[in-house]
Amino acid sequence: MTYELEFSEKAWKEWMKLGAVVKEQFKKKLAERLLNPHIPSARLKGLGNAYKIKLQSAGYRLVYRVSNEVLIVTVIAIGKRAGGDVYEAAT
């Protein structure tokens, strides 16, 4: 069962600002998550059905929300880890 991918408007703007290398790294991870989006270790506490993808080498985080009713993974925030701003943007 494969989920579809969507971006919130704000997340799409952030996606378009990313460099090619970071985008490719996120694309690979997102492709895996569309097959299995519910990764217990990536779940974010206090944000409902939200999960994160970490790019440790680049310092970026991507936050997505899973909707099981319609099989959609929605990217809601992308940004640097510093200061936790990406997690605040996801709320």
Protein language model regions, located:
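Short, charged low-complexity linear motifs
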Residues: 1, 46-50, 73
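Enriched for short, Lys/Arg-rich terminal
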Residues: 2-6, 10-13, 17, 24, ...
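Compact soluble domain cores
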Residues: 21-34
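A short, surface-exposed loop/turn module that caps and links secondary-structure elements
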Residues: 31-55
